[in-house]
């Protein structure tokens, strides 16, 4: 296909137009008084959401060049989401501000490479300062505050996540389910999560989130490689009659058997998903046995004289729900408290008997996985549209609290970045010069962008608010919900340091890439069909733009 090539300023301005469109669509959701965005769906009701990365994923522009700008800034949001699980809107607003300020300097003749060096040095300095000012989370009250802010100022959600973490521990698994009632409820049940995802993405039942969610599945556990589909046929036929889904957890599934499972899944013959067993050697077998106890099934292993081709339904485990993504598998089981407790006692006994610190550590990991259980939050709402929005907010809140436990918390509401602005200026004036200093000044000028946008969404003058906040002590900021200047930590307005750090690093990375762009190669727009009905005479062969 023929390509369109654009150079220099024209290329950067085309990227900027795309970035402007995406940033504005996402920025309206920022802060406690941020608005919602409605996403049209080809099938079903429209989705009303307040989540930056979900909005960013939906935006596709007609102009290929502008769409490249959208894709670049979308990356800042999705990388922040991958790293910290929240802060995607902040990352987008920051990247947009840096790109705008940077392009003005490049247009005025500044060297883009040296500017990027300055941006990178300023970011490195700021990351150190964020870590310096972060406070470790000390109690469940701080966890609740973090969850509340990430869920869009919903106290109930924050408190529920704090309760869930109390029950399953800070490293515990918190899972989301669609509830049957109007209220959101918390329940703790047996379950575990391990670090292996589906073998093939074709097993995903939710293609938007790339997840496989199977309710009340049978679970086939085996420590052997499945090479031939013939080994599986007897058990697959039995399951097909029940109409229930199946999850296979095995050492590996080779191409022929995997292809057959995928074809059956895509044709709707059998709802199936396959996962590689976690661990290696004896540890893998022990973890599979743990899963067998948890799911009330048997591990099909030749050591016990069991063969796959002879497997029956009563050898299979069962669960309430299994959620599999590309990296992890979460099993929610129920009703096996006694068996799980006995297995935990057995692991504790092994820990007492072993002298190896490595073995002890691995046994402790297994014990934590088995004994910790899973906290299930059942999301309640009046309509399906509200339920989807609530689930996204809850997901952000869970991720934010986990990030806060990892790296501590800093004052929220854009306050930390705004206060770091004069500190960065002072450091840059002493340590940088020339165009590197200009690069650092670009970052410095952008640091107040999230706070300004939060204030503007609340109906205040962003520039005035930002200047006022900069003149106050580090912990003081603007509470957009009440319109007052308060001590952010005391008011419970806090952000995880990891979220603030990731957002800043990803924004600076994308801004640097855009500024150093000198040429864009994109597909030419396709010609419209000459015989398009209803067009004006002579307009048939026109381009899309």
Swiss-Prot record:
GO process annotations (BP): protein refolding
Subcellular localization: Cytoplasm
Catalysed reaction, written as an equation: ATP + H2O + a folded polypeptide = ADP + phosphate + an unfolded polypeptide
Xref: InterPro entries: Chaperonin_Cpn60_CS, Cpn60/GroEL, Cpn60/GroEL/TCP-1, GroEL-like_apical_dom_sf, GROEL-like_equatorial_sf, TCP-1-like_intermed_sf
PROSITE patterns: CHAPERONINS_CPN60
EC number: 5.6.1.7
Signal sequence segment: none
Gene3D superfamilies the record matches: GroEL, GroEL-like equatorial domain, TCP-1-like chaperonin intermediate domain
Any one GO cellular component localisation term in the record: cytoplasm
Top-level taxon of origin: Bacteria
Residues where ATP binds: 29-32, 86-90, 413, 479-481, 495
Known role: Together with its co-chaperonin GroES, plays an essential role in assisting protein folding. The GroEL-GroES system forms a nano-cage that allows encapsulation of the non-native substrate proteins and provides a physical environment optimized to promote and accelerate protein folding.
Self-association state and partner proteins as the record states: Forms a cylinder of 14 subunits composed of two heptameric rings stacked back-to-back. Interacts with the co-chaperonin GroES.
Similarity field: Belongs to the chaperonin (HSP60) family.
Name of the featured protein: Chaperonin GroEL 2
Organism, as annotated: Prochlorococcus marinus (strain MIT 9312)
